């Protein structure tokens, strides 16, 4: 069994293949964190809770309990009763007083895992996952708090979530509810997180853990370009293969916080959940509230082991799409080719040329509906513009299908333009504060998805289009953050529920979409902003960044691949000079970098120089050859140009280590230097490998210890693939 309970010791032990998590109970019923680390083969003990040391437990010291609470490693700390570190749960009662104290009541252990109502969450069979639910109660508030732990043994993952229920007769206010907490002794930890901006998302940053609080967060209504719902604590010197890592990743697409607090007694508290700013939930008598899920990973073998745990877990237990283990079509998107300036003839020209070179799908991006000839109108008016799309959408789709390509289409269902028929008819459907001039971003407002009729309208607009033609792919976009938080639908006491209700509404729409169109390939897109595990639950891939420059993408994709499988990262070959940074890179390098993702094209193939055009059939053949390895294989980070400023290298190995694909990018050339010798990863040290295209044979242990020579590189931004295949 993955989960054990020792009644005499009052201990829960949660085991994966390589890790153990231990929870203990104090005599009073406080739920404490005992241990998280390498697998324990015997019974654990309670002594790490330090209950036999001053200030002792409240039942022993017979005095005030605050000194105990402020030191005790709480499994789920509550606010207002004497623990002055960051709390996870703040409850205000009907009299306006804030305070909550929970005590152990009961537990349940069962095989499998229950879904989280209205939320994305991991899943697994009874053979793959086991769950512990610890029920706690606050007898004063008549509040039930259920702490849920699901153990995915093979992937070395533990997921956590919390739900609360008001069993009293008076309404309560949930002013803060985080999903997970980890209390530990400090071991000179450093904090690792992902930061960025539009066009440079998910850059890795790492620094010393200072006394006080350090955090990442979003208050924008999305997981955001700027910070990411992921935090890891690492021991000094941690690299890809060595060091301890404690990581949390939030399965949610709205406001979040991930915080680490180094406390006065040199302990560390790491918490993660919904950002409490502009959040308050009315919990009426009998009501429940379900908090989203956190995915926790511990690695004793550096960041690489953590990465591969997350990759395997998300592929097996988060992505539901039939495309998860299926070849995805090579698409060409017309956005950077045409922007808004296109019509049926132009799209068909692109389709004909794309077909010649092995491309399999045409995606029509923004500008096909309403009066949408630039970005200042028509969002919400999802009616085909037949001045552009002559003969209607079905006519276009049928002609693209006749050419031999599948067809995809772009939507931005959550938005509304001030200049739209929809806004003129229903201005109250936009999120805004009455009497205040609303903030426009990209000439648009955000629809109030807390309103059921708005969800229904937006969904039916999308579904009606999909029912009308043979459409195989949808790009679901979101190009602005939320502001001016006001809903004419919610009453005054529920306005602070709007952020969360918005996210729930978006989830409900996407759930309807994949239920009605189960074979649809859905790609979520927010210019790289709303890239989070919650969206993976609905779509197997997410657009990684609007910056398609191959060199910029190295750092973006390195940070993204730290926790997300390559098959989830939307990546395309685009034109040069690049539309974002103006850089010129070899077409081959652009293809190699895009191959470390979903692979596609974002360009006008009808205008491409011949020397680049002739490379497309080679690239599409490359994708067909390696797509399964990249989608299903194990990822190894070898070199980071972020760190060395010279070169980038990664590998993808099959699970049985029978083949390894290595990608090397020389970012900047260096004068008067010999070939670079790089210690590779991902090989079986006992096997021998032939380098494809040569007669060269290498042992796995030599490649990983002595290294492989990267030779015959000339110039900046050049790259090469090396495919190693095991030989008998």
Predicted regions located by residue number:
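Short Pro-Gly-centered flexible turn/kink motifs
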Residues: 97-105, 281-300, 718-725
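C-terminal beta-strand-rich structural cap/linker in extracellular carbohydrate-active enzymes
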Residues: 699-728
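Active-site neighborhood of glycoside hydrolase catalytic domains
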Residues: 390-392, 430-586, 598, 603, ...
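Polysaccharide-binding surfaces and accessory modules of carbohydrate-active proteins
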Residues: 10-13, 17, 21, 31-261, ...
């Amino acid at each position: 069994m993955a989960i054990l309970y020792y009644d005499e010791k009052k201990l829960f032990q949660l085991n994966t293949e390589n890790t153990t998590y231990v929870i203990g109970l104090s005599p009073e019923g406080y739920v404490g964190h005992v241990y998280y680390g390498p697998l324990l083969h015997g019974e654990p003990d309670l002594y790490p809770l330090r209950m036999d040391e001053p200030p002792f437990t409240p039942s022993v010291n017979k005095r005030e309990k605050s000194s105990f609470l402020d030191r005790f490693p709480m499994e789920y700390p509550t606010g207002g009763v004497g623990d002055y570190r960051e709390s996870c749960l703040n409850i205000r009662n009907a009299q306006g007083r804030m305070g909550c104290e929970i005590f152990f009541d009961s537990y349940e252990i069962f095989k499998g895992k229950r879904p989280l109502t209205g939320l994305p969450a991991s899943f697994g069979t009874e053979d793959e996952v086991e769950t512990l639910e610890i029920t706690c109660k606050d007898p004063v508030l008549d509040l039930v708090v259920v702490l849920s732990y699901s153990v995915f043994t093979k992937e070395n993952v533990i997921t956590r979530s919390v739900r609360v229920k008001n069993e009293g007769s008076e309404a309560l206010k949930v002013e803060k509810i985080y999903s997970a907490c980890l209390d530990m002794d400090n071991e000179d930890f450093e904090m690792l997180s992902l930061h960025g901006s539009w066009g440079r998302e998910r850059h890795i940053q790492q620094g010393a853990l200072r006394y006080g609080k350090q955090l990442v967060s979003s208050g924008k209504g999305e997981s955001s370009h700027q910070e990411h719902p992921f935090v890891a604590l690492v021991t000094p010197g941690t690299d890809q293969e060595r060091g301890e890592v404690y990581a949390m990743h939030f399965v949610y697409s709205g406001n979040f916080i991930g915080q680490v607090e180094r406390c006065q007694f040199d302990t560390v508290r790491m918490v993660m959940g919904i950002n409490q700013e502009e959040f308050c939930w009315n919990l009426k008598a009998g009501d429940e509230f379900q908090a989203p899920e956190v995915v926790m990973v511990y690695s004793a073998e550096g960041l690489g082991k953590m990465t591969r745990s997350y990759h395997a877990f998300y592929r097996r237990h988060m992505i539901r799409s039939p495309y998860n283990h299926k070849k995805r079509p090579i698409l060409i998107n017309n956005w950077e080719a045409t922007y808004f300036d296109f019509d049926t003839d132009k799209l068909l020209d692109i389709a004909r040329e794309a077909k010649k070179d092995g491309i399999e799908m045409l995606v029509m991006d923004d500008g096909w509906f309403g009066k949408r000839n630039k970005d200042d109108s028509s969002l919400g008016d999802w009616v085909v513009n037949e001045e552009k799309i002559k003969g209607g959408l079905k006519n276009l789709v049928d002609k693209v299908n006749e050419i031999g390509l599948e067809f995809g289409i772009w939507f931005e269902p959550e938005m509304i333009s001030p200049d739209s028929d929809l806004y003129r008819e229903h201005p109250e459907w936009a999120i805004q504060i009455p009497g205040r001039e609303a903030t426009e971003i990209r000439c648009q407002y955000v629809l109030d998805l807390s309103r059921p009729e708005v969800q229904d309208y937006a969904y039916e607009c999308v579904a009606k289009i999909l029912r009308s033609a043979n459409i195989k792919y949808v790009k679901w976009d979101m190009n602005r953050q939320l502001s001016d938080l006001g809903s004419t639908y919610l009453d005054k006491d529920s306005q602070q529920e709007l952020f969360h209700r918005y996210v729930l509404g978006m989830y409900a729409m996407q759930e309807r979409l994949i239920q009605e169109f189960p074979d649809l390939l859905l790609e979520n897109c927010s210019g790289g902003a709303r890239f989070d595990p919650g969206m993976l639950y609905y779509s197997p891939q997410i657009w990684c960044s609007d910056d398609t420059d191959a060199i910029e993408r190295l750092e973006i994709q390195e940070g993204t691949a730290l926790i997300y499988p390559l098959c989830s990262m939307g990546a395309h070959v685009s034109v040069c000079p690049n539309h974002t940074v103006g850089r010129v890179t070899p077409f081959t390098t652009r293809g190699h970098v895009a191959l470390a993702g979903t692979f596609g094209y974002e360009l006008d193939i009808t205008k491409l120089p011949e020397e680049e055009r002739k490379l497309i059939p080679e690239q599409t053949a490359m994708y067909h050859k390696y797509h399964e390895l990249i989608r299903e294989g194990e990822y190894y980070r070898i070199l980071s140009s972020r760190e060395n400023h010279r070169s980038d290298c990664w590998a993808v190995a099959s699970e049985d280590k029978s083949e390894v694909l290595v990608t090397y990018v020389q970012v900047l050339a260096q004068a008067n230097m010999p070939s670079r010798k790089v210690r590779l990863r991902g090989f079986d040290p006992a096997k021998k490998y032939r380098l494809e295209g040569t007669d060269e044979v290498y042992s796995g242990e030599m490649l990983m210890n002595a290294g492989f020579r990267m030779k015959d590189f000339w110039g900046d931004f050049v790259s090469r693939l090396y495919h190693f295949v095991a030989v008998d």
